[in-house]
Amino acid sequence: MLEKYKNSKKLSRDLPQINDRIKFPKVRVIDDEGEQLGIFAPEAAIQLATKQGLDLVLVSDKSDPPVCRILDYGKYKFTQEKRAREAKKKQHNSSIKEVKMRYKIEEHDYKVRINQASKFLQSGDKVKATITFRGREIQHSNLAINLLNKMAADLVTIAEIQQAPSRDGRNVIMLLSPKKVN
């Protein structure tokens, strides 16, 4: 029994503030054409909305007084959901893909890594190029930096350097991001 009560309380907080759910002493009212009608008590604004066969919907509670709009709530909710779906379609979650290699890499292996990185960049992901060292190889970190600069030069048509080659412990790291298409 207690479980139902908790859930019902949570649901009532998530409900949109329309008509009788608006609990402010005064609200600024905008009609369905977008014209300001003035500041009203919520009861008077609700009567005005019901005369037109529409709903009073709280648009912004951050301003003083809160802004309410007279509109068809069903249509308003549909357009909000449609906008959210469109925004979700356009959104691309770019993740960071890593390409690892050693500073003594052979030419063919290097080309394979370049191809991997270019595929990642073309799909809109960022690429973290990492060169790892073992033992005393760390003395040759300048060779690794030169190799990463060569990689950036080979990918200059599709990528831009977001983080220049730098040492990070036993690694040298560079971060590339896809170029913005205008």
From Swiss-Prot:
Protein biosynthesis keyword on record: yes
Keywords: Chloroplast, Initiation factor, Plastid, Protein biosynthesis
Compartments it resides in: Plastid, Chloroplast
Gene Ontology MF annotations: ribosome binding; translation initiation factor activity
Gene Ontology CC terms: chloroplast; cytosol; membrane
InterPro entries assigned to the protein according to its UniProt record, in alphabetical order: T_IF-3_C_sf, T_IF-3_N_sf, Translation_initiation_fac3_CS, Translation_initiation_fac_3, Translation_initiation_fac_3_C, Translation_initiation_fac_3_N
One GO BP annotation of this record: ribosome disassembly
Source taxon at top rank: Eukaryota
Functional summary from the UniProt entry: IF-3 binds to the 30S ribosomal subunit and shifts the equilibrium between 70S ribosomes and their 50S and 30S subunits in favor of the free subunits, thus enhancing the availability of 30S subunits on which protein synthesis initiation begins.
Similarity comment: Belongs to the IF-3 family.
Subunit organization: Monomer.
Stored PANTHER family: TRANSLATION INITIATION FACTOR IF-3, TRANSLATION INITIATION FACTOR IF-3, MITOCHONDRIAL
Record protein name field: Translation initiation factor IF-3, chloroplastic
Gene of this entry: infC
